[in-house]
From Swiss-Prot:
The lineage of its organism: Eukaryota, Haptista, Haptophyta, Pavlovales, Pavlovaceae. This is ATP synthase subunit a, chloroplastic. Keywords: ATP synthesis, CF(0), Chloroplast, Hydrogen ion transport, Ion transport, Membrane, Plastid, Thylakoid, Transmembrane, Transport. Belongs to the ATPase A chain family. GO terms for cellular component: chloroplast thylakoid membrane; proton-transporting ATP synthase complex. One of its GO terms (biological process) is proton transmembrane transport.
Length: 17
């Protein structure tokens, strides 16, 4: 769950930028 949340946050952050 932790790794999934981290990857999701990184993916979303990159998409927003």
């Amino acid at each position: 769950a932790l790794i999934f949340a981290t990857l999701s946050a990184a993916y979303i952050g990159e998409a927003l930028e």
